[in-house]
Amino acid sequence: MEILRRSQDEDRTAGIYPVLDAAALQEMIREAREIYMHDRICRYIAELARASRENTWTELGLSPRGTVALTAMAKACACLKGREYVVPSDVEEVFPCVAAHRIILNMKAKVWHVKVEEVVRQILESTEKPALKTRR
């Protein structure tokens, strides 16, 4: 009871200050949207989405909206790393976070105690990564 009483009296937001304002956030979003994505990376994202829908363990995979979210997150990842372009590892890094809560496992997966994280890993491992040319 004492813990409940004390928690109601405390101001848990005291000492918390914003690290950026709305304008700064909008600027970051704009910068991320301008990140370049090669057609090969776009195809890779589309293949990951297709593989998520056709996987033996899934009832539902990435929808078109989920695919758009994956694209936006890959661009944001590249931007945060200081690059002006997306590489396959950006997609691989964000795919588990974007896909895990969108993939619905089928009954077979539930019976066999397959975890969505395993399916996400399987999709990443079985989908061919695009080869991008490096400048010499």
PLM region spans:
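Conserved AAA+ ATPase core "coupling" helix
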Residues: 1-47
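C-terminal engagement/docking regions of AAA+ P-loop ATPases
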Residues: 54-136
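Short hinge/gating elements
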Residues: 15, 23-35, 52-59, 103-110
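Alpha-helix capping/termination and helix-coil
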Residues: 8, 36, 49-56, 78
